[in-house]
From Swiss-Prot:
Signal peptide: none annotated. It comes from the Eukaryota. GO terms for cellular component: nucleus. It comes from Artemia franciscana. This is Homeobox protein engrailed. Keywords: Developmental protein, DNA-binding, Homeobox, Nucleus.
Amino acid sequence: MGSAIFEPGPLSLLNLACSNLTERYDGPSPLSASTPGPSPDRPGSATMSSPLSSPTGISYQSLLSGILPAAMFPYGYPPVGYMYPTGFPTLAAIQSGHLAFRQLVPTLPFNTVKSSEGQVKEVVSTQSQKKPLAFSIDSILRPDFGKETNEVKRRHASPHREEPKKKVQYIEQMKKKEEIKEEARTESRLSSSSKDSVPDNDKINPPLPPEASKWPAWVFCTRYSDRPSSGRSPRCRRMKKDKAITPDEKRPRTAFTAEQLSRLKHEFNENRYLTERRRQDLARELGLHENQIKIWFQNNRAKLKKSSGQKNPLALQLMAQGLYNHSTIPTEDDEDDEISSTSLQARIE
């Protein structure tokens, strides 16, 4: 009750550690020893030249007795993992042997521990200034990413070596185009009857200059090709026939024999419409073409319909409903034509 516990500040503890930690601990740690703690008789054990004391004159034992009773620790030092009070972790660990002085030195490379502060900074700075990976995230996000590689490629590139290859490719392309043109000429000469109708491909499609070898191959298949889709003239044109057909070129009417006509009339009386199988058999028997028999049946149906005057039953049904009425009414012009035709017949007679 009467004695007050002294709690030193952080500044006094720092002075205490800097003034009294003069010797380096080289002995084994109690954690790795088989005995509870280091023995003073053993070589290499930790020994302190003088008891720890603060600049204010208060001994460390007096500071420790008020906060950390000695009865708490069975072996004379705090156990592993013990939570020290605020301000005493470093001093208590050194006093108990858990912490050696070398552990207070910052972890640096082996060759830099013995060097001065300036050399340490220099080594660390050189390690931090190492060249980053070529494809790391930092290098990719840099604004000059890819510039160095492009410059190296430009230096090592040799455009002059590729010129002979391009020349060889151009010569091969020209040979192929000449072969295609020759084939087109022969085809056009064979297809057309007159040589004047064949266009001159050399005039329409002149050979390409040597500069054309700079273009890729697909260009020659589009713009520079001689196909109709390229916008230029085709390889060979088919001459259009004249619309005015002479009478000699008209198809002559089929002259049926008496036997053929009698057989066709007989078949027409039986059935006015022919099936495909029946039409083929009839054409084989009569020695005619199927189209000739088909047209003859169509003409006879039209004649019969015109002579009988009968209308289609479907047309009659629609006319009864008022939906269909194609009946014609004779006009005055038609009557005048009939009168003139009758007068002409009377004069001829």
